[in-house]
């Protein structure tokens, strides 16, 4: 996450070395520039930064998407931007992702990305656009080889009760059930 947006805009040599190292490693570079706009936003994106999870205003989100940036709609313990940004889900479904940020355990006990999925469906958004923001877009953007269910892939998936409520009944990682609807069976170290 490149939080030093002044360093990016001023082409600080250390900042630019970090960005170049991420590019050379084939890693996406996450942004942190909530109020960016105009030429500064364009320069920020042109430096190689591909996402922002700090967007708080709908118009800023639209501008970022228009310039090719991916916007992460976040719901965390402190910042909650879903209500302001959810229209982007219909307008730019290929560029929107859901995320949590600084989520406390008590917050996560009430749900994670699935909370935003349910809120989106309750608002009438297309199921496939919602699932795309919850899983496909992040997996593709971050090159996470999970959840595609292709032959030879690791069997990482969830089982839900139906396509309306999407209540998680089981979670599988590498083909092994790690959550059975009641308890997690992952070993904690």
Specify the residue positions occupied by each region the protein language model found:
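Short active-site segment of divalent metal-dependent hydrolases/proteases
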Residues: 104
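Active-site glycine-centered loops adjacent to acidic/histidine catalytic or metal-binding residues
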Residues: 101
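Active-site microenvironment of metallo-dependent hydrolases
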Residues: 108-124, 128-189
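Histidine/acidic residue-rich metal-binding segments in metalloenzymes
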Residues: 2, 7-72, 77-98, 108-123, ...
């Amino acid at each position: 996450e490149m939080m030093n947006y002044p360093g990016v805009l001023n082409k600080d040599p250390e900042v630019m070395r970090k960005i170049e190292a991420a590019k050379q490693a084939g890693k996406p570079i996450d942004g942190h520039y909530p109020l960016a706009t105009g030429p500064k936003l364009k320069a920020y994106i042109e430096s190689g930064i591909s996402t922002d999870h700090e967007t708080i205003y709908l118009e800023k989100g639209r501008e970022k998407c228009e310039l090719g940036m991916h916007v992460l709609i976040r719901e965390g313990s402190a910042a909650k931007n879903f209500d302001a940004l959810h229209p982007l889900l219909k307008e730019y479904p290929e560029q929107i992702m859901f995320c949590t940020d600084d989520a406390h355990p008590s917050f996560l006990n009430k749900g994670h990305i699935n909370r935003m999925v349910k809120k989106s469906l309750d608002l009438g958004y297309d199921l496939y656009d919602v699932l795309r923001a919850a899983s496909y877009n992040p997996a593709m953007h971050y090159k996470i080889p999970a959840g595609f269910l292709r032959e030879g892939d690791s069997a990482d998936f969830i089982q839900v009760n139906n396509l309306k409520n999407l209540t998680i009944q089981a979670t599988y990682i590498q083909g092994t059930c790690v959550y059975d609807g009641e308890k997690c069976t992952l070993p904690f170290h």
